[in-house]
Amino acid sequence: HTVVHSFPTRRSSDLNKSLRHNFFLDHREYPYKNVKPRIIAEQYMEDEDGKGLKDYKFFCFNGEPRMMFIATNRPVDTRFDFFDMDFNHLPFAQGHPWADGPLSKPVNFEQMRELARKLAKGLQQVRVDFYDINGQIYFGELTFFHFSGNCPFQPVEWDERIGSWWTLEK
C-alpha cells in the first residue's frame, strides 16, 4: 500500500531537484544514460552499537568474489579496509585511510560471500554491497563503476593486479 506524508517545502524541492538530475552526465556511466529518475524511500537502519553502519562491499570478477572492503565511520571520517576472501587484510588503500584498529570478520561473512557470488553470476565485473545489522543481512546495491572508475588503489601496482582479474570478452 502507499503511505503519503507531507514534506517541508525545502525537502520537497530537494526531491524534485534529484528527479531532474541526470546521473549519466556526472561521470558518463552508460548504464544510467536512459534511466528515468525515481525516488525510493527506505526504512532507516542502524546497528545496536550506535557506531554507524558498516558497509561490506564484495568485488566480483567473472561471477566470483575476489576481495571485499569494509567501509566504517561514514560519513564523517570514512575508513576503508580491504580483505581477500580468507579475510586477510590487504596492503593497499583507496580514497580513505584504514580503520584505527583491526576489524573483526563479520559473523555472516560466508553467507554474504555466497550471496555476492549468486548476484554476480554471469557478470564480468560488479561490486555487491551488503549491510549486516544485528545479525541480519541486507542487500545494498550492485555497482558496476566503483568510484566511477576514477580512484586508483595506493600503491598503484594494485590497480594492475586487480585489473588482471577482469577478463573482457573479445
Positions of PLM-derived features:
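Phosphate-binding site of ATP-dependent enzymes
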Residues: 11-96
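A long amphipathic alpha-helix within ATP-dependent nucleotide-binding catalytic cores
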Residues: 29-39, 81-137
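A short, polar/proline- and glycine-enriched secondary-structure boundary/capping micro-motif
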Residues: 6, 77-83, 149-153
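Single conserved hydrophobic/aromatic residue that forms the stacking wall/gate
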Residues: 1-9, 39
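Coil-to-beta-strand transition motifs
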Residues: 51, 60-66, 123-125, 132-138, ...
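C-terminal active-site "lid" helix and adjoining low-complexity regulatory extension at the edge
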Residues: 114, 132-170
